[in-house]
């Protein structure tokens, strides 16, 4: 009463002090101050100069010849900003909701429609898993397919792929390329179960795998139930002439191809939105075993990209 506060406020203060160990209560006796004199207070050590070696930052060169970037001058900033405003206006409740582990349905439906019209692929939205970058999806695939298998990658190839597999405790073997792409005979000699390839536009050679080699790979995968082809369709959107070659998934009749692509080349590398298309039985396995993983792309970006597509 003297302090001008309510009884509830005083009781809450006592409960807080008891909860933190500064006081204790005895029935019918009252409240008592706890003895904290024996508690040792550990002083923070004197801050020393750290020697953390960070990777060097990329220089803003006058001429950028790197192959993994897009021209920022061509990005449709005005359209993207407009779609972001529309998303905030039309998706107030959805933006505050947790995204499904595979990504929001609107984006998965937009991707499925895009793949149908642009790549000739007939996929169900429920087969599509959205993630922040292909590197994250590679890690999910190791967890889905298992570390007891041998993963083969193209040699030469994108070094980071083998690094990610090895960091996820998967055995990874480089397989040499010939003029038509990765060698199926060498895959067999390596006793591999998983072949990670980029048949449409191989990095760094630029080789496009011919149709006969694609069928050879499918025949290899069909020889055993535990064999799969990871088709990395990175940088497949652009060709000097004609339409892009249909992906291996479009000729896969036995559900042996896992398709991966990203929007980092068609939009910008800083928008970390990628996706993979799983065969039906692997999609069911993913949702049964790995659905506890949260989608790593914000709902805001997902809804905005869905409207953009």
Please annotate each region the language model reported.
Residues 232-233:
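Walker B catalytic acidic pair
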Residues 84, 94-226, 237, 243-258:
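Conserved core of the PLP fold type I
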Residues 1-85, 291-298, 306-309:
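N-terminal basic, amphipathic alpha-helical segments
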Residues 70, 200-202, 265:
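Short glycine-rich anion-binding loops that position phosphate/pyrophosphate groups of nucleotides
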Residues 34, 200, 279-280:
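Residue-level recognition of strand-loop junctions within catalytic nucleotide-signaling folds
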Residues 257-309:
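PLP-dependent aminotransferase class I/II
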Residues 3-9, 17, 155-165, 192, ...:
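A generic "structured core" feature
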């Amino acid at each position: 009463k003297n302090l001008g506060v309510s009884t509830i406020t005083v009781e809450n203060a006592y409960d807080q002090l008891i909860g933190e160990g500064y006081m204790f209560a005895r029935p019918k006796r009252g409240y008592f101050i706890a003895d904290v004199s024996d508690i040792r207070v550990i002083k923070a050590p004197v801050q020393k100069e750290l020697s953390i070696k960070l990777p060097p930052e990329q220089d803003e060169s006058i001429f950028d010849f790197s192959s993994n970037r897009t021209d920022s001058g061509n990005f449709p900033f005005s359209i993207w900003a407009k779609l972001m405003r529309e998303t905030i206006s039309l998706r107030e409740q959805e933006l505050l909701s947790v995204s499904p582990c595979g990504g929001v349905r609107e984006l998965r439906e937009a991707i499925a429609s895009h793949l149908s019209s642009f790549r000739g692929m007939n996929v169900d939205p429920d087969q599509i898993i959205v993630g922040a970058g292909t590197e994250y999806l590679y890690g999910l695939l190791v967890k889905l397919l298992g570390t007891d298998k041998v993963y083969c990658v193209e040699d030469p190839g994108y070094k980071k792929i083998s690094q990610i597999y090895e960091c996820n405790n998967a055995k990874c073997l480089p397989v040499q390329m010939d003029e038509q792409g990765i060698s199926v005979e060498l895959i067999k000699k390596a006793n591999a179960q998983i072949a990670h390839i980029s048949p449409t536009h191989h990095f760094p050679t630029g080789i496009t795998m011919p149709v006969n080699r694609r069928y050879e790979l499918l025949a290899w995968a069909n020889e055993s139930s535990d064999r799969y082809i990871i088709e990395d369709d990175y940088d497949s959107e652009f060709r000097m002439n004609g339409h892009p070659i249909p992906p291996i998934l479009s000729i896969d009749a036995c559900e042996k191809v896992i398709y991966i692509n990203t929007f980092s080349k068609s939009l910008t590398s800083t928008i970390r939105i990628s996706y993979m298309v799983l065969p039906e039985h692997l999609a069911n396995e993913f949702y049964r075993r790995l659905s506890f993983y949260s989608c790593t792309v914000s709902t805001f970006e997902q809804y905005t990209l869905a409207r953009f597509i």
